[in-house]
Amino acid sequence: MSTFVELSTKAKMPIVGLGTWQSPPGQVKEAVKVAIDAGYRHIDCAYAYYNEHEVGEAIQEKIKEKAVRREDLFIVSKLWPTCFERKLLKEAFQKTLTDLKLDYLDLYLIHWPQGLQPGKELFPKDDQGNVLTSKITFLDAWEVMEELVDEGLVKALGVSNFNHFQIERILNKPGLKHKPVTNQVECHPYLTQEKLIEYCHSKGITVTAYSPLGSPNRPWAKPEDPSLLEDPKIKEIAAKHKKTSAQVLIRFHIQRNVVVIPKSVTPARIHENFQVFDFQLSDQEMATILGFNRNWRACLLPETVNMEEYPYDAEY
């Protein structure tokens, strides 16, 4: 079983990466160092996580120790949609690059498709509490991001939380220079994303799954929300393979050729989440897990639900 997916640029993207969303400052640096020691080579970051400087420190320390070379790492970051305007985009990108202490990114994604009004807040609001949108769209941002590729600052571009209509608009954009190589979306057995994955793969676009364990630590979780890690069927499959529920949930994506970025700051779990290449789920087990789908999302971004371009209004 390959530990990489090949992107349309021919670059190899490690199929398991470390997610850093909601990794608290003070813990994320250690988490990245532990991950690199455990064999991870793909680290998923974002401007909006407000922790890239610590991730950068960890990467630098590991490179200095000769534990890893920069060219063996695959570092991803994301542009937040308050920065779609050219000048702000270049500044946001430069901040990411400086914080990560790198001279290039392997992959740069548009974090969310809806353009938001520039400002210090992630969700700029008016006095009534309505989120303020921008007339500058993800297509405008894409052109500026293409320049970053041409300048050698970014190896490839992608999107996150886009539906297939939005991806189609990038693919059909007149004068497109660089196609998106991945769409990073929430994906787990309660949200199997079969149609979106099929669409992306048909266009030569990989899919990256975030919240592969169902985002159990999200701050807005409700007691009645379903829990994947506690699901008896998942536990049963895990016991059969002498693995944990988390390992089964990660393996599920690998066998669909979907890149997966579990987040943890706990050293034992970081190691555990990478021990997923020494077993195989049967076709029957895969079918059982796919049968869990209920189109349930942990991450809805409710702030923007009534705005144009809300990505989850479409079926896929």
From Swiss-Prot:
Enzyme's top EC category: oxidoreductase
Tissues and organs where the protein is expressed, per its UniProt entry: Detected at very low levels in urinary bladder, testis and jejunum.
Record: active site: 49
UniProt site positions, description: Lowers pKa of active site Tyr: 78
Signals that turn on the gene: By FGF-1. Up-regulated by calpain inhibitor I (N-acetyl-leucyl-leucyl-norleucinal/ALLN).
Catalyzed reaction equations: an alditol + NAD(+) = an aldose + NADH + H(+); an alditol + NADP(+) = an aldose + NADPH + H(+)
Subcellular location: Cytoplasm
A family per Pfam: Aldo_ket_red
Keywords: Cytoplasm, NADP, Oxidoreductase
EC number per UniProt: 1.1.1.21
Annotated positions binding substrate: 111
GO terms for cellular component: cytoplasm
Amino-acid positions noted as binding NADP(+) in the UniProt annotation, renumbered to this chain: 211-273
Keyword Oxidoreductase carried by entry: yes
GO MF entry, a single one: aldose reductase (NADPH) activity
UniProt similarity note: Belongs to the aldo/keto reductase family.
Subunit relationships: Monomer.
Annotated function: Reductase with a preference for aliphatic substrates. Can also act on small aromatic aldehydes, steroid aldehydes and some ketone substrates.
Name this protein carries in UniProt: Aldose reductase-related protein 2
Protein species of origin: Cricetulus griseus
